[in-house]
Amino acid sequence: MQVQRAITRNLAKANGYFNKTFKPPTVNYTVRGLKAGVAYLQQNQIRFNPILLQENGQAFIQQVIPHELAHILVFQQFGHVLPHGKEWQMMMEQVLGTSAEVYHTFNTQNVAGQQFAYICACQTHLLSIRLHNAILKNKRQYICKQCKQVLYYKDVLANYSNNTKK
C-alpha cells in the first residue's frame, strides 16, 4: 500500500510539473537478486524486489520508487533517451524532488545468492555465479574499475601459488 501511495504522490508531482496526466504504471514484485527495481518502459510496468523492500522499508520507498518511476515518466515524456541521462536526472531532481542516485546502497546479503571471490591488484571483488560462469567458459574477462587490472579467481591463484612452491 505504501508503494502505491508513493507512486501516486510522485505521479501527481509530474502531472503538475508538466501540466498533463501521465499513465500510471502497473506494479509487481518479481525482481530477484541484487536489483531493487526495474522499469519496463514499453510495458509501462515497474517491478520491485520484495525482499529489499521489506528489509529497507522507508529508504526503499524514498529512493527506489522515484528512481524507477522516473524512467517510466521520462519515456512517456521524451521517448527513448539515455537511461540515467539529463532527462532522467532532471525528472528525479526538479520534478520528483529527490537526488538522482543511480545505484542503491542496501545490504544485499540476503538476496545475493552464491558469490565468488576474485582479486586484482587493489582489492577483492565478489562476483555472481553468472559472471563467474562466463569467465570459466572463457567468454569474458572483467577488469577492476580502480586499478584497471584483470580479475582472477582467488581459488585458482591459491592453487597456482601452492603448485609453484613445490
From Swiss-Prot:
Keyword Aminoacyl-tRNA synthetase: no
Residues of the SprT-like domain: 17-152
Keywords annotated in UniProt: Cytoplasm, Metal-binding, Zinc
Catalytic center residues: 68
GO annotation, biological process: response to stress
Keyword Metal-binding: yes
Stored Pfam families: SprT-like, Zn_ribbon_SprT
Cofactor(s) required for function per UniProt: Zn(2+)
Cofactor note: Binds 1 zinc ion.
Binding site for Zn(2+): 67, 71
Compartments (UniProt record): Cytoplasm
A GO CC term attached to the entry: cytoplasm
One Gene Ontology MF term: zinc ion binding
Family stated for the protein in its record: Belongs to the SprT family.
Entry protein name: Protein SprT
Native species: Haemophilus ducreyi (strain 35000HP / ATCC 700724)
Gene giving rise to this polypeptide: sprT
